[in-house]
Amino acid sequence: INVRAKDKACVDFALHAMVTYIMDSIFDEIEDFPRRGISSIKIFMAYNGSPLHVDDGTFFRILEKSRQVGATVFVHAENGEILNFLRSECVKKGQLTPHYHYVSRPPFTEAEAVRRAIYLAGQTDTPLYIAHMTCREAIAELQKAKGTGQRVSGETCTHYLTTTKEVLDNPDFNEAAKFVCSPALRDQEDCEALWQALAGGLLTA
């Protein structure tokens, strides 16, 4: 990309990396980020058992290495172990409709992961960007961290501002499935909390 953009790009741009298939060599690659124009790296606390998942030890190492090179760490914050358990419980009970996507991804699993990510980033003094925040419990964790002066930012998405979990109850499976996303859609009180956080500058994207 940098080769193709050289002498052609008319705007400033940066590249965004994502960790998959954890191996020791990725930490050497992070050291090369500045030269390659990569200013941020995204990790997933969810999706345990998949190549996307990053455990806490690896997350901590990525935070340390990112701080050393001046990169911001983006995080998808959900407690993957609890999500796997809740999903397996739904499957055992035959609860397979889109409604149970929300049941298996409750707000506390996001809030706990947000709190943990903030704490680990604080221990390494690494800038943290919390992607697609959805619930008031997670917003409260962000507010506490920013109140201490920690370098942490939060974003949300349009669908979390405008759509609530009730759409997952549509009896038409195909229609309800259109609204399956992770983290899951929340309730009206969460929508309102997100709007307030945006209006007050707590959420910045």
Can you say where each PLM-predicted feature lies in the sequence?
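Metal-cofactor-binding active-site regions of metalloenzymes
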Residues: 4-26, 43-50
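Histidine/acidic residue-rich metal-binding segments in metalloenzymes
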Residues: 25-205
